[in-house]
């Protein structure tokens, strides 16, 4: 055979070589084109050897690999090689297709082995020949591909020619094919590296010697192209299986899943390479642009199109560059471009001319003078530009336009190329239009292709919209509209034939006569199937009153299919508009497809006026679907709709033709030469191969189906995702190392970005998709290593896809990552020799990384770099992964091991939204004990306070002389301060560095609220870093730590109490010198902010202004110095030996730390038990007692409820001092808490014989009764009582006759006191005034 002779002329092979691996590669290497330029026909055609007479491809020296897949007969490619085997002829056609897939895979794996063993390993074994960077650039992750395909071949061999089993092999390894994306991405680097090597004499000699020694007829460059060619053919080979597979048999869905998977891979590689080339071109444009004053062009997104047009009323042509965000207008001057203007896409308006099919106008809709009337060179060029301008107008519009509405608008355009739209239906359309229709056609048809059969899964549209429709697996969803199509079929056919020969085609692929002969048969089969389906359709239509598909349904199915069954939201409102759209679009597509059937018109015939009218009959209804665009927005959003826009081109691949076009089109598949040429490469009928490559949208839509069915990501969103990925990548190296330091063995400490590979499998059944996602989640929850590469779309998460997530040096495809849940095949799938080869390569790269840390980064970038805008699936994946600006791991319920501060907390400085100024990123509730545990601690402390007390000093000397007079501190506040003190002890911090207790109490009260909310799964607001540091304290020994800190805090306050106290006016029996009287300030000027705490509720409290407070402190210091009794005063609170030492913290510093007017929420207020006080009274000298206790009393005392045992009990040897202290302190407590009532005569006498005179009585809101009494040797004294709780007094002189009062609980009063005596009128009047003031303040508070 001719091919066999050509392949074996060097005698180097004893087997026939696949055409894809030889001639096509040879041609491509001879032409020095990119890998994506000249992929040739299907592998199986290698055996055909001769060009098929019905091959309709661009003339090429390698196009002898004709479309054998499309034929049954003597020209079948299987006859060439397999014809020598009689058993091979006995196989059915389907069996021969399966056998051919396996055999070509075997040849391909042998070629890969030759690259790895005969070239790569020899270079590694030759020291000094090439640097590791050159080796990495030259071979990429070829070893990973070899590992993957070796395992795949082993699986295929075990299938025993079972087509379902063969298809399942591809489905099971769907994720692993991402390594091909990396290889193709690196291929330009490989070509450049090989070119550089051939310029070096020594290296060139090495490669020539190797080729001669191996007796290869092809150079290394041809072998390096094979992976690119092979991966682009898998979906076509699998389509041939589906084409001849009975859809009623079990396993048909598996075949379709495999087609979906490999089509996604092919499309993704195609789009990735196109974007990569555009990114390179963008940098080139940036360097050549003159007079541009704006930012770097990369900030405007991806370069979409570029072309030079003739502009009306402008002498010289203008070169236009269309980016994702702006339209740049320049004038070419030599090799440079002179900036002439630009229009933001958000302000861009498109006006299509109906008179001239080549003209259209772009203008700034706010500045009509900035207008450019452009004349394209061809109709196809105009279609391309107008389509992309429309798309960018919608995507950049200020108003929020529903995605489905955008898609519906765009799908009305005749130019809807697959390389820019990755709708799943677009991909399926490529499979649905086949020139040859088998007898086993599917029940469902594309609405846009009534005469074709559909070879895509019936359930895919349902999954794409987020729900599975159980009753529609056998039929397409577009069936309800088929009856409409029949009415248009004949007219559409006539229109299509009329324009079949229109001129102006960019790529005119003629229809061979042999292919035309096959069409009548195909049409007859389709019509027979149509008759059968119409019966089912009529039954279904009777159950439906209207079409259930809406614009949302249109988006997923070429904008034309209706979705019977459950309606998507909003579908009823737009029912009529959608129906009219469906009819118009259906008729248009039907005309185009029927025209191609009848006369195979040229690829880019211009649309007819009828088509224009049909496509725009229902345009006016579209704005109703929009979400209220702003004024001018409607014009902007839909300006692009004015002009001819026949519905999208039906590029339906005929398998052999599509394969050849796909692999031979010089600028169509991967666009290496010219970005503009890549974009302009459009063929309504001839580029059938491009449709199969448009399936990435299906991946992302299915991945987002659970949240937003059929959500398509515009480039603007994709660009944002790429920014996120870049930021994530930049911070992840630090994060991963810190995560290791934290010792996170489970959870998301080292999250891996999920690659686009999972999008490959997302095309499968929804139940399979869910299973895949669960496996992905498992792999994420147990990441084996912290290595992350932001690859093609994201980093691959799969195991054997080796170089996807691991350093390519690790033998990427090397199945050594056995701990990955997505790794379906283990290392055992490879032979021992293969494992040794891969291990050697892996060790080589690891050794290079060890010597040069930058090598690892550069290698990964070369394999995983994707231009901005290509991160397709990343947006939906980021929603389920930790954000770079939050704590990297900490899942809910997960607690960090150990009590030390994890190093990963340093990541709090990452940028991100802050809900509270100065606060870090939110912290999960896992870092704190539940609020219930904290509450239990306080309850235990409170219960200990309620227990019987052994000494009054122990329970009563707990907070009446605290120097902080600006707020009432309750138990929960004290506990909060205690937690804070665990981080920074107030005794060791300077006044300026530590916040006031009030501030800490406020922060930690907020923490309690946040903890209570976080128990339910969500943290309300981020916390202060110092509060975050309390997490490890709360994790262990919470009770002990809290109690110890409470004691420490009490000592701290005791220290301040003894050094800073406010002066209190002496009572009448106290010996006050005239000097002391002068120093006692009047409290009449003290501001009253609010009433005192009452009934366990938060009440506003009396406060001192900062100025008065400082004055009182100064006066108190002066008084204490002149008083002889001061020497013994500090020891009455002997909490600890250190309590005697003076504190350096000034009251001014404490007061300035918090505004005195800041109220606090308080909890229950525990009143002391007066019975204990009474039992402690003993007889002693009153005068000495007063002198020893009162001179340093607080001027303003407030009641505080503190846990019991917070202070040390007083020494037993100082009983009378404690008794006197408690008496006086309780007096201060009562005076501070409540105002006096009218005076009452004495009712009881204590142990010491001292008479107590009731001076006031008040019942609180909680039914507690407060009695204020005077005690002293002068019961006849009628001097008015003056309180020291901040209430007004006429002068300090009036205080001299006051008796000492104290407070009694409601339980004690009835037992201890009888009826009260009446007081004199004057005194009652004064007391009544004070009481009224107090009650008024209580009501206000």
UniProtKB/Swiss-Prot annotation:
PROSITE patterns: DH_2, PH_DOMAIN. Residues 93-272 form the DH domain. It is found in: Cytoplasm, Cytoskeleton. InterPro entries: DBL_dom_sf (IPR035899), DH_dom (IPR000219), PH-like_dom_sf (IPR011993), PH_domain (IPR001849), PH_PLEKHG1_G2_G3 (IPR043324), SOS1_NGEF_PH (IPR055251). One of its GO terms (molecular function) is actin binding. GO terms for biological process: regulation of cell migration; regulation of establishment of cell polarity. Residues 529-541, 570-580, 695-707 have a biased composition (Acidic residues). Signal peptide: none annotated. Residues 817-832, 939-948, 1309-1320 have a biased composition (Basic and acidic residues). One of its GO terms (cellular component) is cytoplasm. Residues 42-51, 59-68, 798-810, 949-958, 1135-1162 have a biased composition (Polar residues). SUPFAM superfamilies: DBL homology domain (DH-domain), PH domain-like. Residues 1-68, 433-482, 508-657, 684-715, 775-832, 876-930, 939-958, 1071-1097, 1117-1162, 1204-1249, 1271-1341 are annotated as: Disordered. Residues 18-29 have a biased composition (Low complexity). The modification Phosphoserine is found at residues 76, 433, 502, 571, 694-695, 737, 759, 762, 766, 862, 899-900, 947, 1129, 1134, 1136, 1141, 1155, 1158, 1201. Residues 296-394 form the PH domain. It comes from the Eukaryota. Keywords: Cytoplasm, Cytoskeleton, Phosphoprotein. Plays a role in controlling cell polarity and cell motility by selectively binding newly polymerized actin and activating RAC1 and CDC42 to enhance local actin polymerization. This is Pleckstrin homology domain-containing family G member 3. It comes from Mus musculus (Mouse).
